[in-house]
C-alpha cells in the first residue's frame, strides 16, 4: 500500500483528479443575471455551436463560466502555426517568452470575439441593466478561458495529460447524451444497434492499428557499440497527425460563426450576415465541404508539426548520428520530410474516410448530423486515451527497477 501511494503516476493522477474537480465545479457556476430557461439565443445556432464547443472543453448548454472552453486558445495555436511558416513575419526568431506572450494576446483577441458574440445574444433577466450584465458576463467568459489555460498548464506540470484531460472530460460529459438522444430520435432497432456496435469494434481496431503502427528508420549512433544491435531507430507513425486535426478543425470552423453573430448584432439592418450564418451553419453543404477539405489539409499539416524533419536532422547532426546512405543536414531533412509526407497522405485519407465521409449523409437528412459526427469523436477519444496511457507508461518506467540495497 505504501509503495502504491509513493508511485509518481499515482501522485500525478491524484493531482489531475483534483484539477478535474475544479473544472467540473467551475462548469457548474452559471453566468449571473441570465435566463437559463431560454434556448433561443445565438439566433437558434446554440445546438450546433454547442456540439463543437464541447470538443474544446466548453458547454453552451449550461451557460457557465467555462462556456467557451479552450476554443480561443486552440484557435490561437492554429493561427500561430500558420503565421510561423512565413519567414517574413519572423515569429520564430524571437525568444520563447515573447512568443508565449504573443500567443496569449492572440488568445485574448479570439476569446473577446467569442465572448462578445455569446453575451450580445444572451437572454438577460428583466430587472437588470443589459449593458452591465453584458460587461460582466464578457469579462467572466474571457477570464474562464484563461483560467482553463492556466489549469491546463498546472496539470501539465504536476498532473497527467495536460490540456487533453480537460478536453476528454468535456467530451465524456456530452458524448453519451448525444448518442442516446440520436438513438431515440431515429428510433434505431436492436438489430441495427448491434450492427453499429460491431462496426464500432472494427473502427476501434483500425484506430488502434493506425496509432500503434510505426515505420522504423535505422540510425547509426557513434557511441553505440554492440554486436547484438547495430542500430537505434527513428519511428514515424502511420498516421503522424493522429486524431487531433479533427478537434482543431472543429475549433477553427466555429470561429467564423461567432464573428458573424457579432457582426449581425452590430449591424442589425444588414441581411447579409443572417444569410451567411444560414449558409455556413453546421450541417449545411458549404460547412460540410469546407470541413472535409480543412480536415484533409490539417491532417497533413499536423503531421509536419509532430514530426519536423529539420529539427530531427539538426539534432542528429549535433550528436553525430546519421541515416545509412543519407548525408547529414539538408539531405537528412528532405529524406525524413518525404517519408512524413507519404504517411501524412495515408493518415489524411484515413481521417477523411472515417471522420469526413459519414458527414456526407447529412446532405440527405440534417437530423443525422450528430450520428455522423460520432466516428470523429471516437477518433479524438482514442488519441487522447493513447496519449494519457503513453505518459503513464513513461512515468512508471523508472519504478520498475528495484534498489540493490
UniProtKB/Swiss-Prot annotation:
One cellular component term from this protein's GO annotations in UniProt: plasma membrane
Mainly localized where?
membrane
Q: Which GO biological-process labels does this protein carry? A: intracellular protein transmembrane transport; protein targeting
What is its membrane topology? Multi-pass membrane protein
Tell me which Gene3D superfamilies the record gives.
SecY subunit domain (1.10.3370.10)
Question: Among its keywords, does the record have Nucleotidyltransferase?
Answer: no
- Membrane-crossing ranges are 14-34, 65-85, 104-124, 131-151, 156-176, 190-210, 243-263, 285-305, 343-363, 368-388
Keyword tags: Cell membrane, Membrane, Protein transport, Translocation, Transmembrane, Transmembrane helix, Transport
Pfam families listed in its UniProt record:
SecY
Where does the record say this protein resides? Cell membrane
Does Transport appear among the keywords?
Answer: yes
Disulfide-bonded cysteines:
none
Recorded hits in InterPro entries, A to Z, give: SecY/SEC61-alpha, SecY2, SecY_dom_sf
Family assignment from sequence similarity: Belongs to the SecY/SEC61-alpha family. SecY2 subfamily.
What task does this protein carry out? Part of the accessory SecA2/SecY2 system specifically required for export of possible cell wall proteins. The central subunit of a protein translocation channel.
**What's the subunit arrangement here?**
Component of the accessory SecA2/SecY2 protein translocase complex required to export cell wall proteins. May form heterotrimers with SecE and SecG subunits.
What is the protein name stated in its UniProt record? Accessory Sec system protein translocase subunit SecY2
Q: Which organism is it from?
A: Streptococcus oralis (strain Uo5)
Q: What is the lineage of its organism?
A: Bacteria, Bacillati, Bacillota, Bacilli, Lactobacillales
Amino acid at each position: 500500500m505504501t509503495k502504491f501511494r509513493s508511485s509518481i503516476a499515482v501522485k500525478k493522477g491524484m493531482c489531475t483528479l483534483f484539477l478535474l474537480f475544479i473544472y467540473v465545479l467551475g462548469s457548474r457556476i452559471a453566468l449571473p443575471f441570465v435566463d437559463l430557461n431560454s434556448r433561443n439565443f445565438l439566433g437558434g445556432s446554440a445546438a450546433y455551436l454547442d456540439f463543437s464547443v464541447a470538443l474544446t472543453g466548453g458547454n453552451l448548454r449550461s451557460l457557465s463560466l467555462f462556456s467557451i472552453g479552450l476554443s480561443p486558445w486552440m484557435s490561437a495555436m492554429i493561427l500561430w502555426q500558420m503565421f510561423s511558416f512565413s519567414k517574413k513575419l519572423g515569429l520564430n526568431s524571437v525568444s520563447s517568452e515573447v512568443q508565449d506572450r504573443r500567443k496569449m494576446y492572440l488568445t485574448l483577441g479570439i476569446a473577446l470575439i467569442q465572448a462578445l458574440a455569446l453575451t450580445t445574444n444572451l437572454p438577460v433577466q428583466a430587472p437588470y441593466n443589459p449593458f452591465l450584465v453584458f460587461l460582466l458576463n464578457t469579462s467572466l467568459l474571457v477570464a474562464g478561458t484563461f483560467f482553463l489555460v492556466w489549469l491546463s498548464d498546472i496539470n501539465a506540470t504536476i498532473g497527467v495529460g495536460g490540456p487533453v484531460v480537460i478536453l476528454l472530460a468535456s467530451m465524456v460529459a456530452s458524448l453519451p447524451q448525444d448518442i442516446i438522444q440520436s438513438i431515440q430520435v431515429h428510433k434505431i432497432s436492436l438489430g441495427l444497434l448491434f450492427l453499429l456496435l460491431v462496426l464500432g469494434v472494427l473502427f476501434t481496431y483500425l484506430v488502434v492499428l493506425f496509432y500503434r503502427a510505426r515505420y522504423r528508420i535505422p540510425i547509426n549512433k557513434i557511441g553505440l557499440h554492440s554486436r547484438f544491435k547495430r542500430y537505434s531507430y527513428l519511428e514515424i507513425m502511420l498516421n503522424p497527425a493522429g486524431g487531433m486535426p479533427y478537434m482543431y478543425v472543429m475549433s477553427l470552423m466555429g470561429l467564423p460563426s461567432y464573428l458573424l453573430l457579432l457582426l449581425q448584432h452590430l449591424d442589425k439592418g444588414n441581411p447579409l450576415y443572417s444569410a451567411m450564418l444560414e449558409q455556413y451553419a453546421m450541417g449545411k453543404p458549404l460547412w460540410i465541404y469546407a470541413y472535409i477539405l480543412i480536415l484533409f489539409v490539417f491532417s497533413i499539416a499536423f503531421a509536419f508539426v509532430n514530426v519536423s524533419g529539420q529539427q530531427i536532422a539538426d539534432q542528429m547532426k549535433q550528436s553525430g548520428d546519421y541515416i545509412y546512405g543519407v548525408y547529414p543536414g539538408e539531405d537528412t531533412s528532405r529524406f525524413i520530410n518525404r517519408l512524413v509526407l507519404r504517411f501524412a497522405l495515408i493518415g489524411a485519407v484515413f481521417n477523411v474516410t472515417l471522420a469526413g465521409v459519414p458527414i456526407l449523409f447529412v446532405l440527405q437528412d440534417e437530423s443525422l448530423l450528430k450520428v455522423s459526427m460520432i466516428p470523429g469523436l471516437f477518433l479524438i477519444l482514442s488519441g487522447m486515451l493513447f496519449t494519457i496511457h503513453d505518459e503513464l507508461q513513461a512515468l512508471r518506467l523508472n519504478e520498475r527497477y528495484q534498489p540493490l540495497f
